[in-house]
Amino acid sequence: MEEDVFPKAYDPKGLEDKLYAFWEDAGMFTAQSASNKPPYAIIMPPPNVTGILHMGHALVNTLQDVLIRYKRMSGFEVCWVPGTDHAGIATQTVVERHLYSSLGKRRIDFSREEFLEYVWEWKEKSEGIILSQLRQLGCSCDWSRLRFTMEPLASRAVKKAFKVLFDRGHIYRGYYLVNWDPVLQTALADDEVEYEEKDGWLYYIRYRVVDSSDEIIVATTRPETLLGDTAIAISPDDERYSHLLGAKVHLPFVDREIPIIGDMSVDPLFGTGAVKITPAHDRDDYRTGINHNLPLVNILTPTGKINENGGIFAGLSKEKARDDIITALDAMGLFVKKEPYTLRVGVSYRSGAVIEPYLSKQWFVSVDSFRDSLREFVASDSIKIFPPEFTRNYLSWVNNLRDWCISRQLWWGHRIPVWYHKSDEDRIICYDGEGLPEEVAQDPDSWDQDPDVLDTWFSSGLWPLTCLGWPDVEAKDLKKFYPTSVLITGHDILFFWVTRMVLLCSAMVGEKPFSDVFLHGLIFGKSYKRYNNLGEWTYISGEEKHAYDMGKPLPKDVTAKWEKLSKSKGNVIDPLEMIDKYGADAVRMALCSCANRGEQIDLDYRLFEEYKNFANKIWNGARFIFGHISNLTGKDLADGINQNLLGLEDYYILDGFNRLLKELESAYQSYAFDRVTTMAYEFFRNDFCSTYIEIIKPTLYGKQGNDEDRLTKQKLLAVLLVNILGVLHPIAPFVTETLFLKLKEAIGVIVDASSDEITAHALNMLRADSYVLAPYPQAMRITIPDNLHASFALAERLVYTIRNIRGEMQLDPRASLEAFVICPEGVSVDTYVPMMCALGGLSSVEHLTEEPKDRVYSLGVVEGIRLGVFVPIEQITKEKNRLEKEKIRLEKAIESVSRLLGSENFRAKANPDLVSAKEEALKNNRMELQSILDKLASFS
């Protein structure tokens, strides 16, 4: 074969871009909503519009694409809708930083409209980057349906959903404690808060009872919130303090008197048994305050500093105020002591700031009326969660769900569609139409629109509907593809996003948004730390880290650990770099191979190298086949295959392929992407290349069989190649498509149909312009011999015996040897001879009735079949010398151990285990010596 037509190594560079352009330009990814095919739809989890492709994106989109390609080939009308997320907090933060670094200006230096112009400009520039990167990965999305969470359709959907929920009484506004991010200056939902354990202090503070010499000591982790205290609470059953119930204590610095109240929520065993109540800055205290009708005193500004309610501490940061308050209390004799204490601190998932419980007027979705339906969808298996163990997590979370704070103090996002009358804020209009509400348009100076925007997850929660055309209930895509088939996402946003979609979509249209949810694990990378003599450590990066990733042994001062991907830890793997270095197929297969269904995916860097080599194996396997089927035509395949000419190895590979298809179907149904990849990998590499092709090589080269046998093998190779590449296509689309197009070109235009049970479907596949449009491989209807697997297993054991003899005799693996067999009565190995010769490196197998006396051979026995391999003359002397040396070594070892075991002193003093070990060693050495003596005798 011409080298320039089919180079020896697969080089994906250049090929991948051309193939993707071929697919996209031909409209192969475009779904037809009028199709009669069964629907299969996936809505892409939208990446942030300002982001770039990271390994998590690469994983989730590879898994989706594998399913989409598989289902498209399986006869479904597939619709994979791509899109990007406006990502309110994240995008606004990025643009603010950009404006400050480039112009030296902050957001507040612009009007809202001016700032949003910059954000839209940023969006237009950056959106194309991640979309082009998805193309590099091979994602076969329907780009004609590209969506953005703030496009006009999405805006209509969001306003419609808000108004529907508002009119039904499911959305309300009020002053409540929210999770406040003092850096971003916005409220966050409960599940946007991450919790960390930090070392802190438990401070003991003395409160003096008014008009009494009594005092009460309280333990707190946040002494600065003393400024907002409105009560001291004790357990009503706590006899230590029962005499103080109803009394008041003096609150220092702010000159207030606050009551001592009884509340059953107080734990008498924690601290001193008395707790300070700060309803405006603690959720538990808030509930206590409501129950006891206590005032709510907010002491913080939106930036996290002490406000005017803090008296002399106003304007200080909470950290500075804490220190100054403790110093002042100490001077007043009111500070008792402090003790080390481990704190559970809430942190913003976006800014990393410590979250403050903060009293603020916000919009909420009441979830109580949705709780039953959220639970029922999953409990009834209407929505199935994979892996199923996450079902328990989902149901537990739903049972403990609190009202969802949906307002955000941002400029970038969906503006809340509510207007307030300037003279009466309780007079409001909720409007979901275009432009202004009629009443506002008639008197615009008297109305203000709510300045806040909706939580990003509100618009994302409508994503399956938005992508398919809602709120137009007659939209063709909505009718054809809703509910969608499966949602694939990381388990970390099960509550952020998955539950919100179930809630909002079902509330809008009365139906679930998807049938299945597959939650993949989070990617971990290996990090390496180097420790010095002082116990200090640093993370290792660069070439040294890469060397360890590729298997270099670790020195004593370096330790390795699987950790979440982090630039600071040096364990981030850039998927674009991997694509450039190894090719998109290698990256896809590596990710699929480790896409287990647990919580953590340990992404071994060596997988990329392994699957690059496998892509090359696919290429070279096909290259070999092309060299032997160049004379085949479509007519040859249409003529079919004479099953009477099929050998054991042919039936075995065909049956194996049929079994593979069944196992793959099961794996796809359970979203076992790792099994899909591993099974396809092992079948191609081991069963097809290393076994089947090696067995039939003598026939292909004309050393066995006749021309008709050779043509049969050639046809079967072509059929198997197009089918196996078809199985591999969803996970490795580029190399398989390249080979498919070459195969079509080699075989030529296929005109004739075929009814042959082996070739018919392969011909149908080859009629397609691309694997993208080709039907998925089907099981071939063949009659399998009853004893196929037992026979093949026997043949494999015979081959293993031959290889074992070659190894023991240290025979040249390239040398072609002669062998003989002596079979029990009624047993024949004729069927196995081609396989024995091809895989065992034999030139011939002679049938004898007794062992030969005139030649040297090495003998093995398999199920009563005596198999002898003749040793070449030149090897005999060399092997005899080796055996003689080994004989001497064993004789010395036997003598030494025998002498030791014969010593009564040794047996009396030695550990019984040591004695047993020596006896076992002596036994093994004697057996090995006898084996060598037998071999030497065979040379005589």
UniProtKB/Swiss-Prot annotation:
ATP binds at residue 567. CDD domains: Anticodon_Ia_Val, ValRS_core. Transmembrane segments: none annotated. It holds the Pfam family Anticodon_1. InterPro entries: aa-tRNA-synth_I_CS, aa-tRNA-synth_Ia, Anticodon_Ia_Val, M/V/L/I-tRNA-synth_anticd-bd, Rossmann-like_a/b/a_fold, tRNA-bd_arm, tRNAsynth_Ia_anticodon-bd, Val-tRNA_synth_C_sf. GO terms for biological process: valyl-tRNA aminoacylation. Keywords: Aminoacyl-tRNA synthetase, ATP-binding, Coiled coil, Cytoplasm, Ligase, Nucleotide-binding, Protein biosynthesis. It is an enzyme of class 6 (ligase). It comes from the Bacteria. One of its GO terms (cellular component) is cytosol. It catalyses: tRNA(Val) + L-valine + ATP = L-valyl-tRNA(Val) + AMP + diphosphate. Residues 872-938 form a coiled coil. It is found in: Cytoplasm. A motif ('KMSKS' region) lies at residues 564-568. Its EC number is 6.1.1.9. Belongs to the class-I aminoacyl-tRNA synthetase family. ValS type 1 subfamily. Monomer. Catalyzes the attachment of valine to tRNA(Val). As ValRS can inadvertently accommodate and process structurally similar amino acids such as threonine, to avoid such errors, it has a 'posttransfer' editing activity that hydrolyzes mischarged Thr-tRNA(Val) in a tRNA-dependent manner. NCBIfam families: PRK05729.1, valS. This is Valine--tRNA ligase. It comes from Chlamydia felis (strain Fe/C-56).
